[in-house]
Amino acid sequence: MLQRAASNAYSWWWASHIRTKQSKWLEQNLQDIEEKVQYVLKLLQEDGDSFAKRAEMYYKKRPELISFVEESYRAYRALAERYDHISTELQNANTTIASVFPDQVPNFAMDDDIDMSKFAKRSNISGANVPNVPKLPVKDLKSAVRVATKKLQPRKSMKYTGGSTNVVVKSSGLSKPEAMGEIDKLQKEILALQTEKEFVKSSYEIGLSKYWEFEKGIKEKQERICGLQDEFGESVAIEDEEARRLMTETAIKSCQEKLVELQEKQEKSYEEAREEHVKIKESKEKLRSMASQFLGDESVFAKDDGDEVRRTAELDHEIKEMSRKKKELESVKEKIREHFESGANSSLNGTDMAEKVDELVNKVISLESAVSSQTALIQRLRNETNGLQTQISTLETDKALLADDKSDLRNKLKEMEEKLKALQDLDRNVLDKSSNLQTHFDDACHNLDNLSGGNLHEVKPESESDNLAISIEPQKDLEGEKRTLDISEEIKEHQKETGEEKKEAPVKSVKFEQTRNATIAEDSTIPSTNPDTVLESTEKVDSDLEKQDASDKTDSVLDNVLENQAASDQTDSVLDSVLEKQGESDKIDSVPSNVSEKESDISFNGEQQEDQKEKEGEPDWKEMFMKGMENREKHLLTEYTTILRNFKDMKKTLDETKTKMKTENATKDDEIKLLREKMSLLQKGLGDSNDLMENQLSNDDYSIGFMAAENQNMSLVEEQFRLNIDELLEENLDFWLRFSTAFGQIQSYDTSIEDLQAEISKLEQRRKQDGSSTAKYALRSDVRPLYVHLREINTDLGLWLEKGAALKEELKSRFESLCNIQDEITKALKSSAEDDDFRFTSYQAAKFQGEVLNMKQENNKVADELQAGLDHITTLQLEVDKTLGKLIDEFALSGSKNKSDLDLQHSDSRSRVPLRSFIFGSKQKRAKPSIFSCMHPSLYRKMKTST
């Protein structure tokens, strides 16, 4: 589903991206066409009053008009191609939608008709005065007529052969009676499939409506949750166990309700099948009586009725079984309700429970489809039975007329006999499917009973067993030991009877042997032993083993605590010895060795503690072997994953310990160096240097101890202020990154604008040097890219101003948050002074106030720089706007962009207008032969183009 949601989100993004590109392309094209049209209208509106204007119009304006026409044709061709492509894609999309949502196909068709009618009206209005082009004549009329006659020949031959009496074998290879029988059979199958299709469609619609109701309810509840969370500012998360339990309960309840509903439908179907079976039996009796009355022959229907009696008995038995299963389902429903009301949690782990529930859901779904198919089959049986009864009643009314014509009566009776056989086969099919459905119902009810009954309490989760093992009380331990002794005596008596008595071992081995012997006795099913008592004793021994293991674990935890306490005492003694022996430099050199010994002792104790934890986390292999290791691979996989997870945790803790020890060693080395320097200075001093050194060391020790106590006794107020300041510092990093990138863009904008202005100044100098009016249009192709680049830079500058405004607002909000922190610091200091507990001292408040003041100063500096950047960008934007207006006025950029197409005016295919006729008008003159007509055509063409 995530993947589907992700793919839907990506497709939406891609569609919006394409739509944006298409809209930009269309907007650009429309803008270009508008500029070209305005320019061409200016050209056409000019008057050629003088000879110079007419010459300019001929040599300069005429090629521009021709290029405009060519570019307009190209643009129209591109639009037509795009329209063709988009219409094809739209048609494919409509086809896909129609295949996925067939109910909405008429709506699409109506929309298409409306659109086509609109386009048809527009086309008729626009092309009202345009004459219709006649169609091309058929070149090969004889061949077309011959092909048409060949196509019509098979129809004529079929008409002629249809009147003949001979039976013609068609391409299917069947005769007419066989074909009629095949058609009848296929029509009946189609009818059955259509009936099943209607039932499936109705169930699908009902399920779809329920699905949307559930979706609506979920949406309303989610909106209610969001509203409550926003109102109170708190959120509640459901635990995994609670969510799993709720989902399991809902799934089991839904399956149980669906099974009851299907059971009722199946019972109703059984009743209907029994009624139809009785009708078939009555119809057979009527046909038999008619045959014996009019034909005196019962051989047609004289068959053993054992099958019908057996089927009737089976149907009655199935109905009784269905009623019994319905009662069982009601009892199971009551068990489920009591189980869920009592709040009993499922003891199966999540994977096993999910697999069992999935299996039950799949069975219920298959049962639902099978019941719908069975209902459709019974509906078909009812229709055909009613048809047969109608025919029998018609035959009974006309039996007086058919009494004389016995052959016709016999044929009709045979036809009804065939229909009766088909009905009996259909009835037998219904019975077989009913028995098969009953088997599936039994299986589903058994699974539901297992999920709601005893299997829910067979396996216990590991966390629950651990918690129970840790929270054992001493009285329960004593009771468990007494119970273990009683069970051991019973098992010894049983061993004496079977001749398998063994020697006693230590406490744990005796318990293991006792449990194993009890399991062997249960498997071998010895007559002298009751299996129930053996099972009870086994469960008791298992619980005692768990309690004994828990007591061992608690003892090991206490041992680890004592070892850690001894290690800490040893560490304190080492540090005291180091501080006492600081008077001599030679003794100071021995401190690293003591520290290394301390570290090795701590690491050794830590390793012992980790080993003990690993032993505690191991599963109870004795209990698993006693229970037979049914899911051996699953247990091994879980054990492997736990070992791997423990290894990763151990590696992580080891790395953390290494880094911690490295830092501690570095600090201790620094302290040792400092002490050596002090020793050297004190040895050079006066004779009372030893006293001074001891005083300084005591002061240092006091300061170090005070700082350590201060770090250890950090109050909640300090932690809260520290968290707030750290959050602001992290936000500072993100803000500085965005601020630096934005300021880096300013330099690039400066350089690009300067370069563009330099290029524009060069072009202006070239235009001034040429001095002619044609130079402006010649330089337009060079100015156009610069104009486009400046427009892009102008857009980017606007975006930068928006980003700068957002950064400015963020700075204001940060300044307000810093002021709020200052107010909170002063309030906390006043409250601590009033309470006289001094958990938050003035020294701590001054420290935090200093940090906040530094952050406020940095914030003000950044705000000043940002304001300067905004002013600079605004100035650049004004300069760019001014330059763009200047380019539009000087170079008349409203014309066409591509002047490279002017070379097309020299093509041979273009008709040319002579200058004399264009200026002075055309005169009727007799054409004279050219002097160059005697030349070679290629040379004549070159000469013509050169002139």
Swiss-Prot record:
Lineage of source species: Eukaryota, Viridiplantae, Streptophyta, Embryophyta, Tracheophyta
Skewed-composition ranges (Basic and acidic residues): 474-514, 537-555, 580-589, 610-620
Protein name per the record: Protein NETWORKED 2D
Organism: Arabidopsis thaliana (Mouse-ear cress)
GO molecular function per UniProt: actin binding
Coiled coil: 176-205, 247-342, 375-433, 645-684, 744-773
GO cellular component, one term: membrane
Function: Plant-specific actin binding protein. May be part of a membrane-cytoskeletal adapter complex.
Family of this protein: Belongs to the NET family.
Domain NAB per the UniProt entry, residue ranges: 10-90
